[in-house]
């Protein structure tokens, strides 16, 4: 009898249909939150998730400005009160003074998982040398996995599929 396929080697394998994750996608943008332009990064997270075999999800959608205190409060609420399995942020990871997503994320994490940010930088750097400026990170708070994704929709499409096997594995560990 053959063992079941290893999902980490087959990222497009889907879990049983009864598996539903509660996922928050948090767009961090002063201009999008002020209505200057439409948020394209948040919807791109959902599109890429579905296209690349992400589990069935109940989505919590958040769009806020680059304000560290508000970001921290939002991340705590999503983890502690709303009990999201996964929180994916987009935006605010660059070197600009108002890019405070990594600092806000680290302030709420119990444990940092730096490999997520490292692989996104390596993957993106191959196409866009300025990707090295990203300060994205990831980690856990309680049973929630938090990941800072890039702010550009194209970069989300390049990075999120690479992370799916590790996301699944981390969520398995967090769920016990």
What are these regions, as identified by a protein language model?
Residues 1-176:
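Non-catalytic beta/alpha edge segments that cap or flank active sites
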């Amino acid at each position: 009898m053959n063992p079941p396929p290893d999902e980490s080697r087959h990222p497009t394998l889907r879990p049983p249909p009864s598996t539903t994750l509660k996922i928050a996608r948090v767009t961090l943008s002063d201009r999008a939150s002020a209505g200057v332009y439409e948020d394209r990064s948040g919807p791109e997270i959902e599109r890429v998730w579905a296209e690349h075999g992400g589990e069935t999800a109940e989505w919590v959608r958040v769009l806020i400005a680059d304000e560290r205190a508000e970001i921290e409060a939002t991340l705590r609420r999503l983890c502690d009160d709303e009990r999201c399995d996964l929180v994916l942020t987009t935006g605010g990871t660059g070197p600009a003074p108002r890019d405070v997503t990594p600092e806000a994320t680290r302030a709420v994490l119990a444990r940092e998982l730096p490999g997520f940010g490292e692989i996104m930088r390596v993957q993106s750097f191959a196409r866009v040398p300025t990707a090295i400026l990203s300060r994205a990170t990831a980690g856990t708070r309680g049973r929630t996995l938090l990941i800072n994704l890039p702010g550009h929709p194209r970069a989300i499409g390049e990075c999120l599929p690479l992370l799916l096997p590790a996301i699944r594995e981390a969520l398995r560990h967090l769920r016990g």
